[in-house]
Amino acid sequence: MSKRTYQPSRIRRKRTHGFRSRMQTKNGQAVIRRRRARGRKRLVVTIPVK
């Protein structure tokens, strides 16, 4: 039996999908632009703080 592929980590989540990492690449900026144009409430993933 193989283990599940999704092993949640807040650090990895932010580093790969966070705002600053998106803005570092042209394609990431395109993602932000698309989501702004579409009127998304959340542009990138946010980690809820307890």
Curated annotation (Swiss-Prot):
> Could you tell me one molecular function GO term of this UniProt entry?
structural constituent of ribosome
PROSITE patterns assigned: RIBOSOMAL_L34
Q: Where is this region: Disordered?
A: 1-32
Q: Where is the composition biased (Basic residues)?
A: 10-20
One GO cellular component, as annotated:
ribonucleoprotein complex
Q: Which UniProt keywords apply?
A: Ribonucleoprotein, Ribosomal protein
Q: Which GO terms describe its biological process?
A: translation
Q: Which domain of life is it from?
A: Bacteria
Family recorded in the similarity comment:
Belongs to the bacterial ribosomal protein bL34 family.
Protein name per its UniProtKB record: Large ribosomal subunit protein bL34
* UniProt organism field: Syntrophotalea carbinolica (strain DSM 2380 / NBRC 103641 / GraBd1)
This protein's gene is called rpmH
